[in-house]
Amino acid sequence: ESKHYATLLQWDNIYYTPPTQDFKVTKTNVRIGLVQWQMRPYKSIDDVFEQVEFFVDAVSDYKSDFVLFPEYFNAPLMAKFNHLGESEAIRSLAQYTNEIRDRFINLAISYNINIITGSMPLIKEDGLYNVGFLCRRDGSYDMYEKVHITPDEIKSWGLTGGSMVKTFETDCARIG
């Protein structure tokens, strides 16, 4: 019988290491697919994305971690705005930017690949920017702004440069 006595023993194991919550697999090799885009006329954004999906599909078949598109890959859509001046045409092209971003996010999820979009014009409150997006395969995204705008982009289109260089975390590595 215990006679209503009790003993509480506690032993602190100095060799115990608590499990970490970080389940990321650190990759030692990262595969990147660079798209060489042929500028040709497109009638609609659907035509552009038929070509975009071709490249995303091809690069993902090689088990690439990233696919990178070139700057102003959507420029052929400006043909619809030939009747406008240069500055107005690039601003009209900016109307497609959010839809393009959303379509890239869907492709990143569908093909399990991180997509770095080519840069595109985006109208913000304080000006017209040249931006691109990192669309991760988990469905999240980040935006980056081109910092060093060319003199011609300033003169012809009135673009504004971004104010900071950013780095982004991905499932493979930090990029920026």
Residue ranges, per PLM feature:
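Beta-strand-turn-beta hairpins that frame and shape the catalytic cleft
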Residues: Q21-I32, T167-G176
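Active-site catalytic loop in hydrolytic enzyme cores
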Residues: I14, N106, L122-G176
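Short polar catalytic/cofactor-binding loops
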Residues: Q36-Y42
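Cys-nucleophile CN-hydrolase/nitrilase-fold catalytic domain and related Cys-dependent amidase chemistry
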Residues: I45-R137, D142
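Acidic, histidine-bearing metal-coordination/catalytic regions of metal-dependent phosphoesterases
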Residues: E1-T28
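Short, flexible loop segments at the rims of nucleotide/cofactor-binding pockets, characterized by
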Residues: K43-D46, S92-Y96, D152-W157, G176
